[in-house]
Amino acid sequence: MAGRLSESVGSGPGAEAETAADPDAKRDVLEHLCARTHLKQLVMEFDTACPPDEGCNSGAEVNFIESAKETLEEVGKVKSAFESKALVIKRIQLMDALRKRVKENDGCARLIVETMRDIIKLNWEIIQAHQQARVIRENLNDIRRKRYFLKQAEGEKALRIFTTVRKKKEVVRMKIAEKLKFIHRNVQYERKVTTLVQNILQNIIVGCQINWAKDPSLRAIILQLEKDISIQNLL
């Protein structure tokens, strides 16, 4: 299809105009290239004949070299501009040839129209594909942002839970410690009171001069009073 399209375009009057314009374009490009090559050669000859470290640079030579370099840059700019304009002209000639060829309404013209329709359809599909890809990328970026925020919120929530549990454990530990201290103080107090009562009872029995050894009940009481009051003995 591409070969038939090129043949149909090349056989039109626009192609003849393009072919006629080609020699002038080639001649101008060759002239610019020759001028550029000549200027390069002149600059190299001046640099070789009079190196900067030998101190032989006169004002005229330096000016000529600078002028040659500027001219060389201008030639490059002109060449680029010429190539751009030539490309634009070729596009215009091609469009004009296509228009004229389509007006003939023959088999080649219909082929050109169908090809152009296919190209337009493909371009439209490419644009739609780019739009869909952009939407997918935006959705993917949104998902990544939401995932990042969820991870951040999850980390903050886990930290809050850990801090709350640690504080609760600390409060429970402090309460247990306070309760144990309270129980210990009560036990010490009860132990002192019990020891005092033991001493009082022992003194009473001894002061009454009772033969407690003959009485089993008194002997058991005396032996019990002589024991050290502790939690293990109480148990």
Curated annotation (Swiss-Prot):
InterPro entries, per the entry: CENP-H (IPR040034), CENP-H_C (IPR008426)
Subcellular location: Nucleus; Chromosome, Centromere, Kinetochore
Gene Ontology biological process terms, A to Z: chromosome segregation; kinetochore assembly; mitotic spindle organization
Region (Disordered): 1-23
Record has Lipoprotein as a keyword: no
This protein's UniProt keywords: Centromere, Chromosome, Coiled coil, Kinetochore, Nucleus
Single GO MF descriptor: kinetochore binding
Keyword Coiled coil among UniProt keywords: yes
Main location as per UniProt: nucleus
GO CC terms in record: inner kinetochore; kinetochore; nucleolus; nucleoplasm; nucleus
Similarity annotation: Belongs to the CENP-H/MCM16 family.
Subunit-level organization: Component of the CENPA-HI complex, at least composed of CENPH, CENPI, CENPK, CENPL, CENPM, CENPO and CENPP. Interacts with NDC80.
Descriptive protein name: Centromere protein H
Species of provenance: Gallus gallus
Lineage start: Eukaryota, Metazoa, Chordata, Craniata, Vertebrata
Gene: CENPH
